[in-house]
Amino acid sequence: RFITNKSSGKQGYEIAKSLSKKGFDTTLISGPTNLEIDDDINLIKVETAEEMFLATQKNLPADVAIFSAAVADFKLKKKYQNKIKKQDMLNLNLEKNVDILNYVSNHNSMRPSLVIGFAAETDNHDKNAEEKLNKKNCDWIISNDVTNKNIGFNSDFNEVTIHYKNKKINNEKLSYKKKSEISDEIVDRVIDQLN
């Protein structure tokens, strides 16, 4: 038994495919999923936020880092080796996981040229995404509305807004379409930014 969310990883896998298709040497650090990826993509499978953090550290430096995974903010303070038996009441103590996006975007010596985070929002989408953009010190935040059942978690479709730190560029809404198409549009903008 474990604490998780409904994220499928589909958007991250599609972004990795788009990057590879456009000629990027691509590493995908993936949490548990049954999704498949092309052989030319370096796939690193992890099960915990801590494993994802360590794998990320090992794969720096990079030109671009895109953080689309819905990594758990908290973990159990104490891990249980055996099944916890049913009881009337159970209190679980949690502690914070390392904030991987924050770590990478503030890493002085190995910070990628472009750091992109994702924000799964339920309300105040633009305000929350802008706050995350500034708080985490990333270059872009890509937000979506996870209360909309037609997009986001487990869907093959998405609709996102790209929030840019560089305010000379207007924030952009990428309208409802397949996650593969959203990924292609994101990667096209990555290429434009790097050139």
At which residue positions do the language-model features occur?
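Glycine-centered flexibility sites
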Residues: S8-G12, G31, A72, G117, ...
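Hydrophobic/aromatic residues located in beta-strands of well-ordered beta-sheets
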Residues: T26, A65, V115-I116
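A glycine- and small/hydrophobic-rich beta-loop-beta segment
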Residues: P32, E36, D40-N102, N106
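Short, small-residue-rich loop/turn micro-motifs
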Residues: S30, A70, Y164-N166
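Glycine-rich phosphate/nucleotide-binding loop
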Residues: S18, L76-S180, E185-N195
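Glycine-rich phosphate/diphosphate-binding loop of Rossmann-like nucleotide-binding domains
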Residues: R1-T48
